[in-house]
């Protein structure tokens, strides 16, 4: 289908924990289609979701870093970003559906907030905004070093076309 539609490049949307086996296999095919990952990095700042602890555990395992503090977390993220870069990634996408406020925070406070999050599994909404701000700034710097594009979807409206949703399901 891709060849018939004259697709030259296919960018997939992948979580930070993604495996690039499929990308490698696709690049070995003789169809002359470039397959690159793009990073969907929502999980990096999804502190209030029940799956965040699992995300941190999997990140630790895949990066080879035991995550005990914010510095460990950021180093583990950077290791994974290197793998994305090696696989040809040039785009990172962050969904901020609930909106976003940037609140500058110093590294010491961000470290304390992350430590609290690791210990208790909870931080307040104000603390969440601060930690998200700090980590998004870190991510932006990482992307800039790699010459990537960073997309922020702030307050995006989802599921707005009821006719398409009826015909196509959740993709509509």
Where are these regions (language model features)?
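Catalytic core of soluble alpha/beta enzymes
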Residues: 101-115, 134, 152-172
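Metal-cofactor-binding active-site regions of metalloenzymes
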Residues: 1-146
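Residue-level detector of anion-binding/catalytic polar loops
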Residues: 149
